Regions:
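N-terminal intrinsically disordered, low-complexity segments enriched in P/E/S/T
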Residues: 1-56, 60, 76-138
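Alpha-helical transmembrane segments with an aromatic anchor "belt"
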Residues: 61-65
Length: 138
């Protein structure tokens, strides 16, 4: 599975927001690749923004709001990599989640247009989020 999974994660045309339940398989697939992998918790908006800023090393001008998040996610010049995989744990349905998904989808489209894969993977073992699965359950 990890061979097919890393091929998918390295394909810019498949960039987007997905749900996953098997985090270890994603981590195993990315390990040893040159993709940038970050794992953050989404308890609420402020925690998520702080966690992403820390994990991705956002610059000092990051304003800790949705617009600033999108600005940083579509720049990442300070964290150059051939691709990005964001694992987002503990997502809770609500307005903030919807906004976050929109920003991450937009960022994925931006990077795919530049030939870099960008995946936002929401850890959702209950399959409750309205997102496609990254890979099928066996």
């Amino acid at each position: 599975m990890s061979g097919k999974l890393i091929q998918r994660l390295q394909d810019p045309s498949r960039s987007g927001a997905y749900r996953v339940s098997r985090v270890e398989e994603v981590e195993d697939a990315v390990r040893g690749s040159s993709l940038c992998l970050v794992r953050v918790a989404f308890a609420h908006k402020a925690v998520l923004l702080n966690n992403l800023a820390s994990a991705l090393g956002f610059p000092d001008w990051f304003g800790h709001n949705w617009d600033a998040l999108e600005d940083c996610l579509t720049d990442l010049s300070w964290r150059d990599a051939p691709g990005y995989v964001l694992l987002i744990e503990s997502p809770r349905p609500g307005d903030d989640l919807g906004i976050l998904i929109d920003i991450l989808r937009s960022s994925a489209e931006f990077w795919a247009g530049r030939g870099k894969p960008f995946f936002a993977l929401f850890v959702d073992p209950a399959r409750a989020l309205p997102l496609p699965e990254l890979f099928r359950q066996s």
